[in-house]
C-alpha cells in the first residue's frame, strides 16, 4: 500500500521500489572474441588449501563476466588471483602478449604494482583497502597521473568521475569519512579513471540506492563498450541482467 501511494516519490529519491524497471545496458552487439585478454591455464587457487583446481578460462575485451556462487566458495580469492594480487597454487594466469610490460612475462603475479596500472585494476570487497590519498579528488587522480596525465588533466578526469558517481561534494573530504556506499563508488571511480584493460570488481554495487546503482551500471557498461574486460564477483542479479553478463559458477573444490 505504501509503495502504491508513494512509489513515485520514493523512486525519485533513489529508493528501490518493487516492480520498477531495471535499465538495459546489455551489449548492443556480440563481442568478436578474436583473442582473450586474460586467460587461466590449469589454475588452482586458494589460500593454503585449494578452493578450485584445473581451471581453464578465457576473458575477452568488451565483455562482462559475473563470478557467482555461494559464500565461501572462493569467488573473492579467485578474483584476487585473476587480478595478479594472489599467487596461484598451481597453473597460471596469463595476460595477452600485447599487453604485458616490456621486459616482463605474461603472468601478472610477477609484475611490479606500477605495471598493473592501465592493464589490470581491482576494486576490493572492502574499499578502504585501496585508498592511498588524503582527499577524495586526489584518490581518483592517482591512476591518471600514473598513466602519464598532467596534474591538471588528472584532476579533470577525477572531477568527471566524481560527478558521474555523485561524489563531487566530497572532493576535499578524506576517503575514510565517507559512508560505505560512497566509499564503494569512490573505489570504482578510482579504478575506472585509470582505464585498465581488465577490471576485476568484488561486489561493486553493494550498498547503493537505485539512482547511484543505475549510474554505476552505466559507467561499467561504458568501460565494457570501450573494450575493457570486466570480471565481477556479485550476488546482484539485476546487475547481471542489466549488463547482459556471462555467468561463471564458482563452487568449492571444482
Please describe what each predicted stretch is:
Residues 68-70:
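The feature captures the beta-strand-to-loop junction immediately N-terminal to the Walker
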Residues 83:
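Helix-to-loop junction immediately C-terminal to a conserved catalytic motif
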Residues 92-115:
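ABC ATPase NBD Q-loop/coupling interface
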Residues 141, 152-170:
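Conserved ABC ATPase "signature" region
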Residues 174-178, 182:
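Conserved ABC ATPase signature
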Residues 191-192:
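ABC ATPase C-loop
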Residues 199-202:
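Catalytic Walker B motif of ABC-type/P-loop ATPase nucleotide-binding domains
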Residues 234-235:
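H-loop/switch region of ABC-family ATPase nucleotide-binding domains
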Amino acid at each position: 500500500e505504501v509503495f502504491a501511494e508513494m512509489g513515485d516519490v520514493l523512486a525519485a529519491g533513489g529508493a528501490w521500489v518493487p516492480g520498477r524497471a531495471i535499465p538495459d545496458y546489455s551489449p548492443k552487439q556480440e563481442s568478436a572474441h578474436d583473442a582473450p585478454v586474460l586467460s587461466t591455464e590449469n589454475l588452482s587457487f586458494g589460500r593454503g588449501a585449494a578452493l578450485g583446481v584445473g581451471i581453464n578460462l578465457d576473458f575477452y575485451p568488451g565483455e562482462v563476466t559475473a563470478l557467482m556462487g555461494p559464500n565461501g566458495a572462493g569467488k573473492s580469492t579467485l578474483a584476487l588471483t585473476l587480478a595478479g594480487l594472489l599467487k596461484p597454487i598451481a597453473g597460471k594466469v596469463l595476460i595477452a602478449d600485447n599487453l604485458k610490460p616490456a621486459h616482463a612475462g605474461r603472468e601478472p603475479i610477477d609484475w611490479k604494482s606500477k605495471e598493473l596500472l592501465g592493464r589490470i585494476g581491482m576494486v576490493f570487497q572492502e574499499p578502504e583497502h585501496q585508498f592511498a590519498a588524503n582527499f577524495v579528488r586526489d584518490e581518483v587522480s592517482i591512476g591518471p597521473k600514473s598513466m602519464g596525465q598532467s596534474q591538471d588533466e588528472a584532476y579533470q578526469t577525477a572531477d568527471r568521475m566524481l560527478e558521474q558517481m555523485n561524489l563531487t561534494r566530497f572532493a576535499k573530504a578524506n576517503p575514510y569519512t565517507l559512508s560505505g556506499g560512497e566509499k564503494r563508488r569512490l573505489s570504482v571511480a578510482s579504478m575506472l579513471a585509470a582505464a585498465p584493460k581488465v577490471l576485476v570488481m568484488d561486489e561493486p554495487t553493494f550498498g547503493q540506492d537505485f539512482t547511484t546503482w543505475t549510474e554505476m551500471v552505466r559507467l561499467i557498461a561504458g568501460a565494457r563498450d570501450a573494450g575493457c574486460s570486466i570480471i565481477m564477483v556479485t550476488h546482484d542479479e539485476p546487475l547481471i541482467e542489466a549488463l547482459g553478463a556471462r555467468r561463471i559458477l564458482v563452487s568449492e573444490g571444482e
